[in-house]
Structure formats: C-alpha cells, structure tokens
Regions:
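Hydrophobic h-region of N-terminal signal peptides that target proteins for export
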Residues: 17-24
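Non-catalytic accessory segments of hydrolases
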Residues: 24-200, 204, 457-470, 478-490, ...
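Active-site loop->helix "elbow" adjoining a glycine-rich segment at hydrolase catalytic centers
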Residues: 154, 206, 234-237
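Alpha/beta-hydrolase active-site loop
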Residues: 199-219, 276
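Substrate-access "cap/lid" subdomains that shape
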Residues: 216, 250, 259-368, 393-400, ...
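Alpha/beta-hydrolase fold nucleophile elbow
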Residues: 221-233
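Catalytic nucleophile serine of serine hydrolases
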Residues: 232-235, 260
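Short glycine-enriched nucleophile-adjacent loop
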Residues: 237-249
Length: 529
C-alpha cells in the first residue's frame, strides 16, 4: 500500500490538472500525429494521445447550444457545427453548482487519513453542455467500430461534473470500448418547475440531446450504434431510469449500467409538487413584481440564481417530475405497466451506501418512524439480526430501502419483459482502520470500474485483482450484453425464477442478496419500498 504522503501528492497534482483543464481551450497547433474526429467535411475535432499510446482523448466538446439567455429553462437546442477546427484538449467548466461534491471528496479523503484541503472545486459556468471522449487509438483500428459507454455522473442532480477523479475514461477505453462522459444542467438550472415555463426536466432533456449527438456522429467517433450503453451512478443512474422510460430517448441506446440509485422508484413527483418552490425562487429573485417574469428570470445573473436557489431548495432532492412535456408518467407506473424501452440491464448497489450519511445519535425505531412511517416490529427485528451494532442495523435499513430494494425491483421488471438483467452487490472494504470505518461506501465501486485508484486512493493487490475483474465485467456487458467472459467467475443471470446475484468483495461469489428478505418485507408494507 502506498503511503498517505505519496497519495496526497498524486491527488494534489491531479486536482491541479483538473482545474487547469477546466479553463478555456488554448490553441494548440495541429500535427500529423494528433488524433482527429472528422465530424463532417467542414468540422474537425483534434484530440491528444495518451502517454502509452493506447488511447485517444477528446475533451470539452459541445453537444448543444449554450443554455443561456433565451435558452435558460428551455429544451436544449441542437448544435450543428463545432467550427472548422476544434482543439479538444481541455475539459469545459462544470455546470452551475455549489461545492457539495467538493465537500464529499474532502470527506472521503479525510476518511482515508489524507489532507482534504488538496481537493479544489472546478470552474463552473451556465455554458456547460459539453462531453468528453476516450477511445482506443484509432490509427491502428480504422476499420473497427467499438461499443460505446456513455457515463452520467451523480450528485443529487445538483452537483458533480463529467471529469471527476473517479470518471476519467482512458483506462476503461484500453479494453476496446469508447467511453463518453456527459454534462447536464443541475439544480434549479436543470430541474425547475414554474408556471412561466412549459417544461421542468431540463437536465434530463440535456442527456437526451447528448445521446442524439452521439448517435448522429457515431460513425465519425468510431462507435457501433447498435451497442450504446448508458452508465450512471447515484443520481446519474436515477436519470437512466427515466431514459429507459420516456419516449424521446427510445432507440438511442440498448443497454444500461445502473449503480447505486433508487431515486426514481422512491420519488414520484409531479410538476405541481415542485411549482411552490419554483414560485418561491422567483419571488426571492424578483420580488413582488409579476410583470415579464419569464424574461426577468432569464436575465437574472447565474450566480444570483445559484445563491438564492441554495437557500430556497435547501434539503430538496432535484428529481425528475411528471410535467406532461418531457416526462408523461412516473417511472414506477412505467415499470409496473412493463412499458420500459427494450434495454438489457446491469444493476447493483454497495454494502454500506448509507453509512457515512447516518446520524450517529439516531435509533433504529426513530429512523423507521421518521423515514418509513412504520414501527420496529418483531418480524423486522428478526431481519435485522445480521448485526447487534445499531449503526450497522441503520445502514442495512437505509441502504436496503434507498438502494438495494429499488435495484432488485427494477431488475425484476426488466427480466419480466424478457430483456436480460444482471445484479451485483459490492462489498469490498479498503485495507486499514480508517477504511474499515467507511466500509463499501456510496461510490466506492467507481475507482474499480474505471481503474482510477492511482489518482487518489491507496490500493492493494486485492483491489487491483478486483479492478481487473470488474472492468472486464462492465466492458463485456457493453460489448455483448452479457458481463461473462473468459477466465471470469460466472455471473448468473437474474430472472423472475432465479434471484442469484454476483457478490464482489475480497472474493467473487454467487448468492441470494443478503437483504432479499428485508426487501420482500418492506415491499409487503408499501406499494414501493
């Protein structure tokens, strides 16, 4: 294991590069060796080759018109041209947000014994609809097309960016897939309901527009249009739920990788539910003046909108809402009616999703009453006998209700429509006393999938072996809709008749999910867990 000093040095350098990369792209002279994407006869995107020559990167490519001015709180408009020559060497600014994800990274670094002050927030802008592409070196494989993985970041739909340390895609691209990470409007800029505007789910529509751009330019990128996989974690996975359901995204992808989210099943909001907060934001920004509200809201400074929204929406989860324009029914209704798009699914959650977010003073009984509105019955107590530790019991409850049970329900729904489902349970805990206190936390699986340990995490040989295995599972799924492959432990398909899953920790095994009975109990108490 590396020393904390070396880890922190690498992390400092990495975040410095991230911040530098989020600045405006500088003009770098073209050369014969620079990789290119020829979008059309008039537009060329110039990227750069990785140090080992195995992959190419094209960073900060616009996929829609900037959502500013008249396009604030409007559906994204297609971008037809990136210019004659576009130098894609730097990441674009992140979408407007406070420092929530920066604080999250600080907490994780601190949890592993590092100095949280090395983590720096990236530049932000309302002009933020950009994507990044990592692909296998194209010069050696001009006649090949590759499966495409489109990654959607998390952050409660109010924070996060497409090039966080966990999401850099070059090592995954070495497995002969194309990795594309996309941005979308966040917070009140992306999920806003107000009578002055017809639509509510602007961030979701941004994701649809990014998929349209990718499909339109798939040949130039070198991708296979029949093998496009959307992949997301946390809120990113929650948005994938709606991408699997809404009409505008049908046919834009055929596979989905869904990591650690249950928001679309747990939250069933309508536009009307969110309008009161939208009106409050408008009132805080504009006062009592009700004249020309639409124009005045669009004219308000982005920084002021962000600052006011942080107060108005404090504690609010920015979920997609049924608005009759972009989302026509709740995701749960679409799932129950078996109306999801035909999509194969790889889905799962981590053992300690909720551990770092729990109130240490909360009792199991109070949590059940406050969060689920039920009492701590004898039947439930029996199901929680997995641990005598109160905090562990709370984690089992919160993780099951918030992540595991919704994932199992979605896997069942997809399996019922004869599409394929594959379910995992991630249990690996890093070595060391500090790591043990965090467990297999929310987001812990990401460095294994992307193979980004060296950027900021201490890594043992166990972690490296698991990384190779998980990266192969994920990329095999993108290639064939089946994660299994040569020399990999068998991953059983999840069906309506067989609930076997893959457990990924210190070892790989097949088992029934340890929270399966708890999920069945919760489902018996509620229409949806």
């Amino acid at each position: 294991m590396k020393s904390n000093k070396n880890i922190m040095k690498k992390l400092s350098v990495f975040f410095a590069l991230v911040i530098l990369g989020s600045c405006a792209s500088e003009h770098i002279s073209n050369s014969d060796s620079a990789p290119e994407i020829q979008l059309n006869p008039e537009s060329t995107i110039i990227g750069k080759t990785s140090d080992n020559g195995k992959t190419e990167a094209f960073l900060g490519i616009p996929f829609a018109q900037p959502p500013v001015g008249k396009l604030r709180w409007a559906p994204p408009e297609a971008l037809n041209d990136v210019g004659h020559v576009f130098h894609a060497h730097h990441f674009a600014p992140a979408c407007m947000q406070a420092d929530r994800i920066t604080r999250w990274y600080k907490n994780v670094v601190k949890g592993f014994g590092g100095d949280p002050e090395v983590v720096i927030k990236p530049a932000v802008s309302e002009d933020c609809l950009y994507l990044n592409i990592w692909r296998p070196s194209f010069e050696e494989n001009k006649d090949k097309t590759y499966p495409v993985i489109v990654y959607i970041h998390g952050g409660s739909n109010k924070a996060g960016w497409s090039y966080e340390p966990n999401y850099i895609g070059h090592r995954m691209a070495e497995e002969k897939v194309i990795v594309i990470s996309v941005a979308y409007r966040l917070g009140a800029f992306g999920f806003f309901s107000h009578p002055a505007f017809e639509y509510s789910n602007f961030g979701l529509m941004d994701l649809v527009e990014s998929l349209r751009w990718i499909n339109k330019n798939i040949d130039a990128i070198g991708g296979d249009a029949s093998r496009i996989t959307v992949m997301g974690e946390s809120a990113g996975a929650g948005n994938i739920d709606y991408l699997m359901a809404i009409p505008s995204s049908k046919g834009l992808f055929s596979r989905a990788i869904h990591q650690s989210s249950g928001s679309a099943i747990r939250n069933q909001a309508t536009r009307e539910d969110h309008i009161p907060l939208g009106l409050k934001l408008s009132s805080e920004l504009l006062g009592a003046d009700g004249i020309n509200v639409t124009q005045k809201l669009r004219d308000a400074e982005a920084e002021k909108v962000l600052a006011v929204s942080e107060k108005v929406y404090k504690g609010h989860y920015f979920d997609n809402a049924v608005d009759g324009k972009s989302v026509f029914e709740t995701f749960t209704d679409t799932l129950k009616l078996e109306k999801l798009h035909p999509v194969d699914l790889l889905i799962g959650s981590n053992e300690h999703e909720s551990l770092m977010y729990l109130d240490k003073t909360e009792s199991v009984g109070n949590w059940l009453k406050n969060q689920l509105g039920i009492d701590n019955s004898d039947n439930l107590r029996k199901l929680l006998n997995v641990s005598s530790n109160k905090r562990d019991q709370l984690n089992v409850l919160a993780t099951a209700s918030g992540f595991t049970c919704p994932a199992i329900n979605l896997a069942k729904g997809v399996a019922a429509t004869r599409d394929q489902s594959w379910v995992y349970y991630f249990t690996r805990q890093r070595d060391g006393e500090m790591a043990e206190s965090m467990g297999a936390y929310h987001g812990a699986e990401l460095p294994y999938v992307f193979d980004t340990h060296d950027d900021w995490l201490p890594t043992s040989q166990v972690d490296r072996r698991l990384t190779k295995t998980m990266k192969n599972y994920w990329t095999n799924f993108a290639k064939t809709a089946n994660p299994n492959g040569l020399y990999l432990p068998n991953w059983p398909r999840f069906t309506v008749n067989s609930s076997k899953i893959l457990v990924m920790g210190n070892d790989i095994s097949n088992a029934l999910h340890p929270s399966l009975e708890l999920c069945e109990y919760l489902e018996s108490r509620f229409a949806t867990p």
